[in-house]
């Protein structure tokens, strides 16, 4: 003020910009004026967006590819997560450029703009999302993502600019915590419910209702693949075992194939399935009792009234905790009745289809029979 009074002789001669430009702006204060740190709002917004882009990934994984969620490997989870980030890289820039927000950010009351309040261009939004993926999420890799998230949290809460924030500002509205919690919980509940529904739908067989032998065979092949029982053998349209041939694949042993099924058919409709296995040896590998399990599931899960809401109940019936391969077992589902009988002569040890004689030099005889039929 003293300088102005000395140097300016009249109000009309005053040029305020000459004096204002001499001040150094406080970058940290400027950042606080734009938006106070809200790390958890940003974190949950990102989580909602990732959950949403995970839905089409789950659709392909379960509905189209019929993957068994109980046997999905950690590597497959990582690949699916990377695909989800890839979708986010495609979709988020479009949403930011068009609306200034995403579904997750909207739930948390966040908009992303340029410092002047204008929306980002597509290229600016794409660059921002790519930097979030690289620096903030560590390319979506386990452990790396955890470390990057922690470091970003520390920088952000100290008021430092994050790698992807240059040229953009996140603005937060004044909505209450209750509203955000409700929207966040609802979003995750919807995503979780849809994902579980798709995983359960993957268990349903391709053919439903009254089955022909060919349709039954297709169901058996479906479940053998679903439960990863090998690709060497499959049932043909006549319900007989056929050895699959693959380029550069040579099989050793087991050339006779699994024990065959026999069928009872009335007016073209499959009414009953029968299976029997017998062998005498000191060591018996692979009785093929899993095929009896798949046969029951192929017939039972096809019945009217079986849906994604109860498919787990019939699948549980064939689990090793319920159906032990060396013991008699019976089950029923809808109008399908099944009986499995196991007769073993001699002292033995059993484990997952493997029989071992406990008497040196003395063989055991294993006889297994299976019958599944539609109730009259």
Region annotations inferred by a language model:
Residues 3-291, 305-317, 327, 332, ...:
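Membrane-interfacial and juxtamembrane segments of integral membrane proteins
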Residues 294-305:
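Surface-exposed amphipathic alpha-helical segments
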